[in-house]
Amino acid sequence: MTLRYDVGIINPFLDAVVGVLGMMASMEVTLGKPYINSKRSAAGDVTGTIGISGTVDGIMSLTLDEPVILRIVNNMLAENYTEINDEIADAVGELTNMIAGQARQDLTKQGMTLKSSTPTVIIGKGHRISHITSAPILAIPFSTPEGSLVVEVSFESEGTEPA
């Protein structure tokens, strides 16, 4: 496999999660150990996915436990949501877009030219989505007192072999 996930790729996504959640939701997250997702799917209560294209093509997904997204949105909007609804789904799409956008901005400083698609949001307790990519999927887990969230990133490059 020719594609390696070095800190130049990983750090923009780490920084984006920490920055966006800190700024928008006054929320601190604890980084877990990044790993390659060999199951090639994401499982959780709500997921936002976004396509990234340009110098490299890829995807980013943000998967959250229900208590985590409820706290984020309640902090952002000064509300008291108790279940996932349309407003929560909209917020997941916006968070996905903001995290991908911040990471893209940092990757642009490294000489990449990237743009994003419109996010798609998948809702359902314990849902599982399959990533449609032949490239390795890097999972970056974070924890909060309410539960976990995972950002998954996969970039295709010339010569990338199916995992």
Predicted regions mapped to residue ranges:
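N-terminal auxiliary interaction/assembly segments of multi-subunit proteins
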Residues: 1-163
